[in-house]
């Protein structure tokens, strides 16, 4: 089976042929993504202050609160994460042969997040401490690359 056929199978099924480690680690990843998605979507601050430790921005009396706009976008990001997560859960339930494609999406998404942080950098005064996402991006990218490679391997029989 070619690399293209493994990444984009002609038919989705539960017949996963890759290394089981990639499957188990993906289950751990979606557990982490579940927490992250619900936190961003449901928390009053979208996790912006409580987890990412971005400061609460001051505003003048009678002026609109800029924090509400930030919280809105955090919640919108959370909704997008939950939609992605639903696809991940469906694939783990019914279409496990799409696991290499799912790992590829993680391999693409993490550098895009890192690029967004580079294009719109926030310096130290914006944070109370280094946010978890900033610390975890590189390790997550490395793990995702390894898991993508493992998911493309054929199972040993």
Can you say where each PLM-predicted feature lies in the sequence?
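Short, Lys/Arg-rich, polar N-terminal cytosolic tail immediately upstream
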Residues: 1-15
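Aromatic-anchored segments of alpha-helical transmembrane domains
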Residues: 33-35, 107-117
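Core segments of alpha-helical transmembrane spans in multipass integral membrane proteins
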Residues: 51-89
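Juxtamembrane helix-break-helix junctions at the cytosolic face
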Residues: 85-100
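Juxtamembrane "helix-exit" motif on the non-cytosolic side of transmembrane helices
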Residues: 115-125
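Membrane-water interface at the C-terminal end of transmembrane alpha helices
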Residues: 142-157
